């Protein structure tokens, strides 16, 4: 597998949960769009969503992907475990958020992942996933993997 997309807590509710912030697309809509882009670029992609921190840590540790795209959702601000998992595997990842975390409540403005991420994309709604995948494909091509 080339790219793994991980979605954290409550992202299974996209399309229903606060559409004025997160938009109307479901996680399935986003995944289908990403799958098409990956297929058109001869890149393999897999998707994982969990509301449980330990399951996300396990998935990061077990991943054979060349690069990971992650929307850690609320765990962005609280999960030292997810941060440590990325440090342990020493694999590039792109942090993505549908909303601009720096234009939200004060407690949402600190990311425990941004400083160790390959790159970060905030505030472009579902299009942010497309931007992240394009950059992941660029990374794979640059590395010649």
Curated annotation (Swiss-Prot):
It catalyses: 3-dehydroquinate = 3-dehydroshikimate + H2O. It is an enzyme of class 4 (lyase). Transmembrane segments: none annotated. Substrate binds at residues 71, 77, 84, 98-99, 108. Pathway: Metabolic intermediate biosynthesis; chorismate biosynthesis; chorismate from D-erythrose 4-phosphate and phosphoenolpyruvate: step 3/7. The keyword Lyase applies. The record marks 17 as: Transition state stabilizer. Signal peptide: none annotated. Its EC number is 4.2.1.10. Pfam families: DHquinase_II (PF01220). InterPro entries: DHquinase_II, DHquinase_II_CS, DHquinase_II_sf. The keyword rRNA-binding does not apply. Gene3D superfamilies: Dehydroquinase, class II (3.40.50.9100). One of its GO terms (molecular function) is 3-dehydroquinate dehydratase activity. Keywords: Amino-acid biosynthesis, Aromatic amino acid biosynthesis, Lyase. GO terms for biological process: amino acid biosynthetic process; aromatic amino acid family biosynthetic process; chorismate biosynthetic process; quinate catabolic process. The active site is at residues 22, 97. Catalyzes a trans-dehydration via an enolate intermediate. Belongs to the type-II 3-dehydroquinase family. Homododecamer. This is 3-dehydroquinate dehydratase. It comes from Francisella philomiragia subsp. philomiragia (strain ATCC 25017 / CCUG 19701 / FSC 153 / O#319-036).
């Amino acid at each position: 597998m080339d790219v793994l997309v991980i979605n954290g807590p409550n992202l299974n509710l996209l399309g229903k949960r606060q559409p004025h912030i997160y938009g109307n697309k479901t996680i399935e809509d986003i995944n289908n769009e990403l799958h098409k882009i990956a297929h058109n670029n001869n890149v393999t992609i897999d998707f994982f969503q969990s509301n449980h921190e330990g399951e996300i840590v396990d998935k990061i540790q077990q991943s054979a992907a060349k690069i990971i795209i992650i929307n850690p959702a609320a765990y962005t601000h609280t999960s030292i475990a997810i941060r440590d998992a990325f440090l342990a595997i020493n694999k590039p990842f792109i942090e993505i958020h549908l909303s601009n975390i720096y234009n939200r409540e004060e407690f949402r403005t600190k990311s425990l992942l941004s400083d160790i991420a390959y790159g970060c994309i905030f505030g472009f709604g579902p299009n942010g996933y497309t931007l992240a995948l394009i950059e992941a494909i660029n990374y794979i091509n640059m590395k010649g993997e």
